[in-house]
């Protein structure tokens, strides 16, 4: 009985596909090449021969400059936005592998995805560095 169980496990291991595994997510990972970092929250990538603009999923990053949606913008937000942009640019530039876990296409036509660099969630890294906040309905107050 034990021998049958071991044989079954061995056969199962032979047929289960092996690939990137990040957590318990049943995700599909799409390889990508960075083209241009727009800011800390958006990047142009080359994906399967097509240029796409990708917004980070689940996080909000500071804005580089004031806009109509951001009446509370201040110089501190601009400073943090530059740090976030440079952080993303540096990490994408040194990554050996970049994978996208695409969540959706937003109403502006941007792809919303989790960006993995060498198996690490780049959005989470921005959160750890205090260069992003979790994407909630609350407007982040960078200028406190």
Where are each of the predicted segments found?
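Small beta-barrel nucleic-acid-binding modules, primarily SNase/OB-fold domains
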Residues: 2-5, 16-144
């Amino acid at each position: 009985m034990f021998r049958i169980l071991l044989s079954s496990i061995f056969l199962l291991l032979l047929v289960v596909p092996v690939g990137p595994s990040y957590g318990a997510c049943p995700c599909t990972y799409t390889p990508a090449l960075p083209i241009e970092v727009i800011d800390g929250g958006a990047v142009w990538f080359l994906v399967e021969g097509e240029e796409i603009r990708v917004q980070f999923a689940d996080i909000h990053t500071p804005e580089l400059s004031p806009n109509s949606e951001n009446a509370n913008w201040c110089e501190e937000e601009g400073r943090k936005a530059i740090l976030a942009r440079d952080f993303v640019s540096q990490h994408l530039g040194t990554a050996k592998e970049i994978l996208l876990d695409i969540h959706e296409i937003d109403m502006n036509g941007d792809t919303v995805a989790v960006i993995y660099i060498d198996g690490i969630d780049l959005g989470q890294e921005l959160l750890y560095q205090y260069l992003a906040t979790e994407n909630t309905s609350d407007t982040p107050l960078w200028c406190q």
